[in-house]
């Protein structure tokens, strides 16, 4: 029977007054204990994760240990941890949402042997707070009391070790209950885990950092930064309009000088500002770090500054030579931080000379983060000299107003500087990507498909699903070598003369149950991560490449959308959604499908499904397939024309096709020619996504997951308009239809690169497409700008995207009749769905950034060992696409590289070009105009560079110990680079990118084989490489764009 108590809460108002609030608190005779030793598991309702039975004791951390040592408690070696509800709530209230979510994810993770015990709802465990008792003492008393009850509940069969940092608690409770031990966390590690070196090192690092903070707080220092305004004052200031709230974005090219705050929430609606707010200098940033949610006070207009327009190299100089800022913009200073965005940071120790200059016994070391946007971090360690050649991970603990730099602690070593695996690990950590293997508990939920026990369709599913195996010609069209097929198509004539178009998607949700271990893991990952030489899957291969993959000639479960179309106009008459069983008849590659569409039937010999047929059967089946492909293409043309009339955009993307040998290693990388079948498949997928979006919104108007693409801000188009104007084109950006038509008309017949660059600029001006819950936005905000659709979602790739899994569940709930209530119980509320959408959006950005950074890594490694003075491949044609005050931005079509080329160096010399076009550095000056820049020497020689001029560029690599290497471009001639294969250049060929990946990978493999003694490379490889073996295909498939000109997903398709 429930017992009711009253819980008193003391809350502070905006005005600083304290309110006493009394809430009802109900106690239960039993709550889940999640122990295998439970004498009454049915009474305790132990339905979730249980603690391991293979442990010598249970460990109960108190609230302070959970707060300070959570990263050690995350070690999978530490088993049998019982987190008390009291400790978890202390983390939530005192450390904020980020730390609390980290703890929640730890409890959900099947790889970690830990559980939550709701001690404050258990009748025998709950202790009311005594009058005059401090919150800290009550929390320790409650946790100890719950630990003692837990010991007796398990029939005194498992010792309990409570770990705490409270010496008084150790003295008071240490010998109070037999079988329940109370010790410090350091003693716990010393006694129970003496060989867990990483935990001991991390513990010492955390203790050292804490001691440094305590010492600093006792010393009297002058203020380096102003104190932050109290929270209640910040909230009142935001509400009154005095302050502005937004996210801090640091300019990575001028990280010491420039940062911008983009308005969000109430600030963006109530403010008259139409641009970001400039935060100039570290003092004005006031200890905020890139990504923090900050509160800003605007400075008087007389103190506003302009955005820097010069090229920068993060050299820390406040004023570049001849720098001329843009027009003054709103400028402010940070007065408070609402939410810190601290995470793990990859850093590098200073060189041995710098360490020695600080003194032989110096323990405080300033380490330099890999990310330019993060300030140096001060840590305490005696390993600085030993680790100076390694990339390591640190965490920030505090940033006091008396300190120039934040304080942090050392966490772990990643790998050697410059080593491929170490650099890849750096990219993963910097984007908060976890790539641990799938756990045993997760794999136990997976279906089995082996020669001894093959997977097959169940009789129950045959009864409940629509069986299309004998009635529909279903086939897939995918890139060459693709093995994880998640979409197939069908089209057929109906008896009434109309047509039926079908899109059939892998039924992943049949195998991934809501709230299962694999579902929680997929939700955490949110997407499959594609790097330049590998991939990390969202789902195990047994699903992604086997039983969920819609391979040819095998039975598979699918979720289908089928439309009845008018036979001539292709207007949609009706639509059907449902679960189906399909057997794909053909697994076609794009090129083969295009050949069949064009009437080139010689490709038939390369289609496996035709090989064993006699001539008559082959001809009949060929005619059937060709009719289907041509009819699909005709339907897709009609769909596309309809979207075009509404303003659908076609923006620039560079795609490549991977050619494989028999062993599935890369044989070649060929520029992907635009084929009409690409458009055909894409239009069918867009149609399915659109109609599913409408269906789930109609059924769940307040909790459907859709994808919106907001219209871009008009000021973001200014550079696009000016560049187009330089070529005599007018770009109308008032609507998506006007923009699409303008881009179509902006063609230079003598230089196709111009239109590609203009479309690229249009892409960069776009807002990001975002997932959202329909209950959190007004319906007029649902629109997808890039696709010109009123409602859109992602339904067609559940193998790779968790958003699609949610959409499949919503669709099943919308069309279900028999189990409607049961299915709907597993759906997210609007609040929970919106939180999930924020997580997925965040993970999508991380996936895009990591792919781009890994591509840049490979580009640098490819050019790093080549002599730019003699190597022919280091000289290439480039196109100027932007003018700056001290140089230009150049695009190199052959490699897809974008970068800065300086026209004035650090010595103040400017580029001068002779009659033959070759350049040299001479004293002189620069004069920048809107669409051109002129270099004039003191001798009177001048050369002018215009927008879209072709120049000859030398490519080299700017190396860095602390940061990633970067591509360096130098204009060596103001004339185009002449190559024997001009057609290759016109196609923006990325042919040499195959050499880039193959050569870098091969050189790394050879180096590893040559080294008999590797420095923990094996350990790092096992930790960060999910895909085994040397097959580059299993790592590279699905990569659509190895170039930096990555715009294929920028506008949200």
Curated annotation (Swiss-Prot):
The modification Phosphoserine is found at residue 989. Residues 465-816 form the RNB domain. Residues 365-431 form the CSD2 domain. The keyword Phosphoprotein applies. It comes from the Eukaryota. SMART domains: RNB. Disulfide bonds: none annotated. SUPFAM superfamilies: Nucleic acid-binding proteins. Component of the RNA exosome complex. The catalytically inactive RNA exosome core (Exo-9) complex is believed to associate with catalytic subunits EXOSC10, and DIS3 or DIS3L in cytoplasmic- and nuclear-specific RNA exosome complex forms. This is DIS3-like exonuclease 1.
């Amino acid at each position: 029977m429930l017992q009711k108590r009253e819980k008193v809460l003391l809350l502070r108002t905006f005005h600083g007054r304290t309110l006493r609030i009394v809430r009802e608190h109900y106690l239960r005779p039993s709550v889940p204990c999640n122990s295998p030793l439970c004498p009454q598991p049915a009474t305790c309702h132990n339905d979730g994760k249980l603690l391991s039975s293979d442990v010598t004791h249970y460990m109960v951390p108190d609230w302070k240990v959970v707060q300070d040592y959570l990263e050690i408690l995350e070690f999978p070696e530490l088993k049998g941890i019982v987190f008390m509800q009291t400790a978890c709530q202390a983390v939530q209230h005192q450390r904020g949402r980020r730390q609390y979510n980290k703890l929640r994810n730890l409890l959900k993770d099947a790889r970690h042997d830990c559980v939550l015990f709701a001690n404050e709802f258990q009748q025998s465990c709950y202790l009311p707070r005594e009058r005059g008792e401090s919150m800290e003492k009550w929390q320790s008393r409650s946790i100890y009391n719950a630990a003692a009850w837990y010991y007796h509940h398990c029939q005194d069969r498992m010792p309990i070790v409570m770990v705490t940092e409270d010496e008084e608690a150790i003295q008071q409770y240490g010998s109070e209950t037999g079988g329940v031990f109370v010790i410090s966390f350091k003693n716990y590690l010393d006694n129970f885990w003496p060989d867990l070196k990483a935990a001991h090192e991390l513990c010492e690092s955390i203790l050292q950092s804490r001691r440094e903070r305590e010492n600093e707080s006792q010393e009297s220092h002058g203020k380096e930064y102003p104190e932050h305004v109290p929270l209640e004052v910040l909230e009142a200031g935001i509400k009154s309009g005095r302050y502005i709230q937004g996210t801090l974005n640091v300019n990575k090219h001028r990280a010491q000088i420039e940062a911008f705050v983009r308005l969000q929430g109430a600030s963006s609606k109530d403010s008259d500002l139409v641009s970001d707010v400039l935060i100039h200098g570290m003092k004005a940033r006031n200890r905020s770090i890139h990504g923090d949610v900050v509160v800003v006070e605007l400075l008087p207009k007389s103190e506003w500054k302009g955005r820097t327009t010069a090229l920068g190299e993060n050299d820390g100089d406040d004023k570049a030579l001849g720098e001329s800022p843009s027009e003054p913009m709103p400028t402010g200073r940070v007065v408070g931080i609402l939410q810190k965005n601290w995470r793990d940071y990859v850093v590098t120790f200073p060189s041995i000379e710098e360490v020695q200059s600080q003194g032989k016994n110096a323990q405080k070391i300033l380490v330099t983060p890999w990310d330019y946007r993060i300030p140096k971090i001060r840590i305490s360690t005696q390993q600085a000299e030993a680790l100076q050649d390694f990339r390591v991970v640190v965490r920030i603990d505090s940033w006091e107003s008396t300190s120039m730099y934040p304080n942090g602690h050392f966490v772990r070593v990643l790998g050697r500087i410059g080593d491929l695996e170490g650099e890849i690990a750096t990219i993963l950590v910097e984007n908060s990507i976890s790539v641990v293997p799938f756990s045993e508990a997760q794999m136990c939920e997976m279906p089995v498909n082996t020669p001894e026990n093959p997977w097959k369709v169940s009789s129950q599913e045959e009864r409940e699903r629509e069986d299309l195996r004998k009635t529909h010609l279903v086939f897939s069209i995918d890139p060459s070598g693709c093995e994880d097929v998640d979409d197939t198509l069908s089209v057929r004539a109906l008896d009434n003369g109309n047509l039926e178009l079908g899109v059939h998607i892998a039924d992943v949700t049949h195998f991934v149950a809501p709230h299962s271990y694999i579902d929680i893991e997929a939700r955490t990952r949110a997407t499959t991560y594609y790097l330049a030489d590998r991939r990390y899957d969202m789902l195990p291969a047994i699903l992604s490449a086997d039983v969920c993959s819609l391979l040819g000639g095998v039975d598979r479960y699918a979720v289908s959308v089928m439309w009845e179309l008018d036979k001539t106009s292709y207007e949609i008459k009706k639509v059907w959604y449902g679960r189906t069983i399909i057997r794909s008849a053909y697994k076609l590659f794009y090129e083969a499908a295009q050949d069949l569409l064009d009437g080139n039937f010689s490709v038939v010999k390369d289609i496996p499904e035709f090989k064993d047929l006699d001539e008559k059967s082959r001809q009949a089946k060929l005619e059937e397939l060709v009719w289907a492909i041509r009819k699909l293409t005709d339907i897709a043309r009609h769909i596309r024309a309809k979207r075009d009339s509404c303003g659908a955009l076609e923006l620039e993307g560079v795609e490549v096709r991977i050619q494989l040998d028999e062993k599935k290693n890369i044989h070649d990388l060929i520029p992907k020619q635009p084929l009409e079948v690409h458009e055909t498949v894409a239009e069918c997928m867009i149609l399915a996504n659109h109609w599913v979006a409408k269906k789930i919104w109609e059924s769940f108007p307040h909790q459907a997951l859709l994808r919106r693409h907001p219209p871009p801000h008009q000021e973001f188009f200014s550079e696009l308009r000016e560049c187009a104007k330089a070529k005599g084109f007018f770009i109308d950006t008032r609507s998506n239809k006007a923009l699409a038509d303008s881009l179509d008309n902006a063609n230079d017949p003598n230089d196709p690169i111009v239109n590609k660059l203009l479309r690229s600029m249009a892409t960069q001006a776009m807002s990001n497409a975002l997932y959202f819950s329909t209950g959190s936005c007004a319906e007029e905000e649902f629109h997808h700008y890039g696709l010109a659709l009123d409602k859109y979602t992602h339904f067609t790739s559940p193998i790779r995207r968790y958003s699609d899994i949610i959409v499949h569940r919503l669709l099943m709930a919308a069309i279900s009749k028999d189990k409607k209530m049961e299915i709907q119980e597993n759906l997210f509320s609007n609040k929970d769905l919106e939180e999930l959408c924020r997580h997925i959006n965040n993970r999508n950005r991380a996936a895009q950034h990591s792919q781009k950074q890994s591509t840049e890594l490979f580009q640098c490694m490819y050019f790093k060992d080549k002599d730019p003075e003699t190597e022919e491949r280091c000289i290439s044609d480039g196109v100027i696409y932007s003018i700056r005050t001290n140089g230009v931005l150049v695009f190199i079509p052959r490699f897809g590289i974008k970068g800065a080329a300086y026209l004035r160096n650090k010595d103040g010399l400017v580029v001068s070009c002779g009659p033959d076009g070759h350049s040299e550095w001479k004293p002189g000056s620069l004069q920048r105009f809107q669409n051109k820049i002129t270099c004039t020497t003191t001798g009177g020689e001048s050369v002018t560079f215009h927008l879209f001029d072709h120049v000859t560029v030398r490519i080299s690599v700017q190396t860095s110990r602390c940061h990633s290497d970067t591509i360096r471009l130098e204009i060596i001639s103001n004339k185009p680079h002449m190559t024997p294969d001009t057609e290759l250049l016109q196609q923006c060929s990325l042919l040499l990118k195959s050499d880039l990946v193959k050569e870098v990978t091969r050189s790394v493999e050879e180096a590893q084989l040559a080294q008999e003694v590797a420095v923990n490379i094996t350990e790092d490889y096992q930790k960060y490489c999910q895909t085994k073996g040397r097959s580059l295909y299993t790592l590279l498939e699905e990569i659509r764009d190895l170039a930096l000109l990555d715009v294929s997903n920028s506008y949200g398709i």
